[in-house]
A protein has these predicted regions:
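Bacterial N-terminal signal peptides
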Residues: 16-27
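Surface beta-loop-beta hairpin patches that serve as ligand-binding interfaces in beta-rich domains
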Residues: 59, 67-75, 464-521
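Detector for repetitive beta-architecture
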Residues: 84, 116-118, 129, 144, ...
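Acidic Gly/Asp/Thr-rich repetitive segments characteristic of extracellular carbohydrate-active
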Residues: 89-131, 513-516
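Extracellular beta-strand-rich solenoid/capping regions of secreted or surface-exposed proteins
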Residues: 107, 111-115, 127-146, 154-197, ...
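Predominantly extracellular beta-rich ligand-binding scaffolds that present long acidic/polar faces
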Residues: 129-131, 142, 340-346, 357-489
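Extracellular beta-strand/beta-solenoid scaffold signature
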Residues: 131-135, 158-165, 183-192, 208-217, ...
């Protein structure tokens, strides 16, 4: 098995939306650049000091890529605030909130600030539960209320119940805080109710022992979690899961963008389904893009029963078997519906992308996996070593991915939780010690137009078969055998250029290329 080193992969976001069928008319396309990954430095905030490293660069491309949709961080606009409130450890809540007579507590300032105003929290430590709820005014889209930490302002656990920062009002911006949970079993930040336009940005959340650093629940709608460093949330008892971000049932339209989330005992992001504990409707409308996820005890992203999820342009790596997990990087299971996984870089794991498996109720439907780069997936330490695995699901589409340097590139139809119904697998570069391991439960499989390494084995119902036998039993008359010969930034070889079939994604040239990277734009 080959190992790839460095930043080889590319990221492109095609224009097609979540569609259960991708076989629409494709088109020639112009290319574009891709957004940077992970936390970007912002002066005078805790993320200004985050060490720069190559994993924050945009995923490399040999040329511009068609259909890019991932949204880059925008530069902070200059704002003229209508009033400034000042909070200081040396202040007094009886003051007028000016620089000369600052307030003592953040909560007092929260109760006073109005649309278009800013609360400047001076350097120091504030042991309080910050509640932006019935005590606070709502901002407006044109005049948000900003809660600004300055000089490393630090929030630690204070008296009261619930998360350390509780957001229940729309159009508030929480910016630039060190939120230190001090190993207590608490959420760092919670969003609930109508929080449209409310944002947690440019902050460092660390060292918690509760369910997550950030959570959305109780019909939380429209929250944005952007450009934060989230790390060190660990539980060592009970279910041992302490996640970076948990999106709970009834949440809607949540965005998780450009965060670094790592070294937690749970997942970087989990969309939690209601199965097993609730009759509430699932979360709907989750966007996870441009993040850097690595080194958790569990997964990078875990999508349970949630609807309308987009996971794109993320870099995810360093997930190996642990005492509580198998080393899967990205998991979509239970009754997830309409989930788009595109343009991600996934490497150094025990399994790259897994669809199906655990089941409670209907199987996953409308899952689209496209233009991902999955490589260096290993069975070391007891891992499975699978690039992409499809189990119980219906209509899963796997197109234009590059799967390289794996123990087994693709597994389908082994019956875990039920059949892999009507999967579509086209235009993929497939390389592994075992290229494809196909079980007996993949009714309606459409397999073709893939470039498959000649060095890999084929398995059918657990038995090694010849390539010709495999193609005959699967009806694959269009896949070709050839070395991937991947070049700089995972550019495909001539065997893959213009050799794909139109699956509804924009392309450049006479026909789509096979694999995740499109040349010629």
């Amino acid at each position: 098995m080959r190992n790839f080193k460095g930043n080889f992969l590319t990221l492109k976001t095609p224009v097609a939306a979540l569609a259960t069928s991708l076989f629409m008319l494709g088109s020639a396309a112009h290319g574009a650049s891709l957004p940077a990954i992970g936390v970007q430095p912002v002066p005078n905030t805790p993320v200004a000091a985050l060490p720069a490293h190559a994993d924050h660069a945009a995923i490399a491309t040999p040329s511009p890529q068609p259909g890019v949709q991932a949204t880059a961080l925008s530069a902070a606009a200059s704002t003229n605030y209508t009033r400034e409130w000042v909070v200081s450890p040396s202040g007094n809540d009886g003051g007028d909130g000016s620089a000369a007579q600052p307030l003592r507590t953040i909560n007092k300032a929260v109760s006073l600030a109005g649309p278009g105003e800013i609360i400047r929290v001076q350097p120091g430590t504030y042991a309080e539960r910050v509640v932006i709820g019935a005590n606070a005014k709502a901002g407006t889209p044109e005049a948000k209320i900003t809660l600004q930490g300055e000089g490393g302002a630090r929030i630690t656990p204070g008296p009261g119940t619930g998360g350390m920062v509780q957001v229940r009002r729309p159009n508030w911006v929480i910016d630039g805080f060190n939120i230190d949970v001090q190993r207590q079993p608490l959420f760092g930040v919670t969003f609930e109710g109508d929080v449209t336009g409310s944002m947690l940005v440019n902050s460092d959340l660390r060292d918690g022992g509760g369910g997550a650093a950030v959570t959305t629940f109780n019909k939380a709608t429209g929250a944005i979690i952007e450009n934060n460093h989230i790390h060190g949330f660990v539980k060592n008892s009970g279910n041992k899961d302490s996640h970076g971000v948990v999106v709970q049932p009834t949440s809607k339209d949540i965005t998780v963008r450009n965060n670094d989330i790592h070294d937690n005992s749970g997942d970087s992001v989990q969309c939690l389904g209601p199965e097993g504990f609730s009759s509430l409707p699932p979360a709907e409308g989750l966007l996870v893009e441009n993040n850097h996820f690595y080194g958790n005890r569990e997964n990078a992203v875990d999508i349970k029963t949630c609807y309308g999820v987009v996971i794109r342009n993320n870099r995810m790596h360093n997930f190996r078997p642990t005492s509580t997990a198998k080393g899967d990087v990205l998991v979509v299971h239970y009754s997830a519906s309409n989930v788009l996984v595109e343009d991600n870089e996934i490497y150094d794991g025990a399994k790259g992308i897994s669809v199906g498996g655990n089941r409670s109720g209907p199987m996953p439907t409308g899952i689209v996996v496209r233009r991902n780069r999955v490589y260096n997936i290993t069975n070391a330490g007891g891992g499975e070593g699978t690039g992409i695995r499809l189990e119980n699901s219906k209509g899963t589409v796997v197109v234009n991915n590059t799967i390289a340097a794996t123990t087994t590139a693709l597994i389908m139809g082994h019956g875990t939780g039920g059949p892999t119904q009507t999967p579509v697998v086209r235009n993929n570069i497939i390389e592994g010690t075992v290229s494809v391991d196909l079980g007996g439960q993949a009714p309606g499989l459409k397999l073709g137009n893939n470039l498959i390494s000649p060095s890999g084995q084929f398995k059918r119902n657990g038995v090694v078969v010849s390539p010709d036998q495999f193609k005959a039993t699967t009806g694959d008359a269009s896949s070709i055998s050839g070395p991937p010969s991947l070049g700089e930034a995972f550019s495909p070889s001539t065997d893959a250029v213009d050799k794909g079939v139109d699956v509804g994604l924009p392309f450049c040239g006479g026909a789509p290329d096979i694999g995740a990277v499109e040349l010629g734009c």
